[in-house]
Amino acid sequence: ANHFLPGEGFRQDPEELVRISQSLLEGLLASICPEGVDSPESGESSGPQIGGIGISAQMHGILYVDQNGKAVSPFYTWKNEWGNESYQAGKTYAQYLSEQTGMDLYAGYGSVTHFYLQKKGLIPQDAAAFVNIGDYLAMVLTNTFEALADVTIAASFGGFDLKKRQFALSAMETAGVDISYYPAVTEGKAVGTYQGVPVFTAVGDNQASFLGAVKDRERSVSVNVGTGSQVSVFSGELYETGKGEVRPFP
């Protein structure tokens, strides 16, 4: 699933990612419930019940969907570096947005990629919104069309107000970003069902790894020496020191 499409931009095929993910899900459900899934709504108890389907997704990246929830672009991953290209007055796209908004925005962040594509005229004409790949998987599984992003994913796009837990749309619009494509922010929402089982909005992979790795989040430190190379701790309050990155927790 790490295969990139030919050419620059570290882009992936969203339909292939969904196909692989759905195949893995089918195999998992079959191994847990060989005689069929008993959903919470079914009222039956002939076998194991599945309380819900959770999704964890790599953060920052975006893809565009049309009004019917169909992908109309590749998935531009967090590795995309177009935001580091020169924009104006000797500044890159990312530097310009950071200066204009007063927020830290980097190449690979969804808001920066979106701004680059907007200025280059590369947003598909039939695009209605952008979402993360995990959001798109949830849409496909539940056959829903509303563009939603869990707060953990939404914040990773950049241009996000941590105190309000919403996009800083006014600041982004003032900086010249077309804000009409931003998804609605939600928290822990079941967007629909798959085989009768609730499917929840995707959670950021960093937060999901912390949630799954520690027993006591209040007294634990998670050290990831893999791809992320991250040290993560939990805080019940918004605690900004300027020495690390604060991310919403589910």
PLM regions: where:
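Gly/Ser/Thr-rich active-site cleft segment
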Residues: 97-206
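Acidic, glycine-rich active-site loops and adjacent beta-strand->loop/helix elements
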Residues: 2, 59, 81-82, 189-191, ...
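Glycine/Thr-rich phosphate-binding loops that ligate phosphate moieties of nucleotide
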Residues: 5, 51-95, 122, 235-250
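Short coil/turn connectors at secondary-structure junctions
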Residues: 60, 72-74, 125-128, 178-181, ...
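Short glycine/serine/threonine-rich phosphate/pyrophosphate-binding segments
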Residues: 57, 111, 208-210
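Short beta-strand-to-turn element immediately C-terminal to the catalytic PLP-Schiff-base lysine
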Residues: 63-66, 117-118, 139-142, 161, ...
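N-terminal glycine/serine-rich phosphate-binding loop of ATP-dependent small-molecule kinases
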Residues: 1-73, 99, 126, 173, ...
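Catalytic phosphate/nucleotide-handling subdomain of diverse soluble enzymes
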Residues: 204-250
